[in-house]
């Protein structure tokens, strides 16, 4: 038996909204540590890694390991049934081929049920980029600020250069109409609205990426106020968003995390590199 209750169902509603344009079908691995999803996008260019912790649910039970094949677009539709201030109970019996959802509002006068048919999905095992030794550079900043940077720069080019040293992170595009650059220096947080910028750099890094995917990753600003970027030479960039429940009546704070990975572009002209 698998059974998991989340008091704030809107968190999962936002989560599936964030990844639906990247992932089509995926296997959700359920075990005693929680729910995990790892999947490539449809073009096999980017990778999504999600872990919802068992401790992030107000109730979690998983009697044995399960693999649940789901269509993300269908999950997104299911969670559109969820209204504001509603909880969700997700369950599946061991002998069932369905994943059941029960949404209930906090007044307990509205209950919505849905039974989603599970899929049999044959997917190759994925090798999540391992960086136990740490990244060459890490930057922590406001997720909304990063979203705005990518959205604005995508008006000028389909490629963005990210350059980091201990004193600055630069986002640069080179387009037909001209060149654009946004530079952020380290700064302390001054308020809840100004998270600040933290830069840790072992060496100077400069890489280029398809801005289309960075725009899709940065949609996750609705899940977390802070994003951590991890970069190393010849390795995919990592976007990490910690998923938290900040509602006043939350039983827990940290729900889990979602990570996005994208390999740097390798075919840019040498004139664009140092």
From Swiss-Prot:
PROSITE patterns with a match to the protein in the record: PCNA_1 (PS01251), PCNA_2 (PS00293)
Keywords: Chromosome, Cytoplasm, DNA replication, DNA-binding, Nucleus
Cellular component GO terms, alphabetical: chromosome; cytoplasm; nucleus; PCNA complex
Biological processes, Gene Ontology terms: leading strand elongation; mismatch repair; positive regulation of DNA repair; regulation of DNA replication; translesion synthesis
Function: Auxiliary protein of DNA polymerase delta and is involved in the control of DNA replication by increasing the polymerase processibility during elongation of the leading strand. Involved in DNA damage response.
Organism per entry: Plasmodium falciparum (isolate 3D7)
DNA-binding region residue numbers: 61-80
Family statement: Belongs to the PCNA family.
Name of the protein described by the UniProt record: Proliferating cell nuclear antigen 1
A family per Pfam: PCNA_N
Site (May be important for nuclear localization): 213
Gene of this entry: PCNA1
CDD domains (UniProt xref): PCNA
Subcellular location: Nucleus; Chromosome; Cytoplasm
SUPFAM superfamilies named among the record's database cross-references: DNA clamp (SSF55979)
MF (Gene Ontology): DNA binding; DNA polymerase processivity factor activity
Coiled coil: none
PANTHER family: PROLIFERATING CELL NUCLEAR ANTIGEN
Induction: Induced by DNA damage (at protein level).
Subunit structure: Homotrimer. Interacts with ORC1 (via PIP-box motif); the interaction occurs during DNA replication in trophozoites. Interacts with ORC5; the interaction occurs during the trophozoite stage but not at the late schizont stage. Interacts with FEN1.
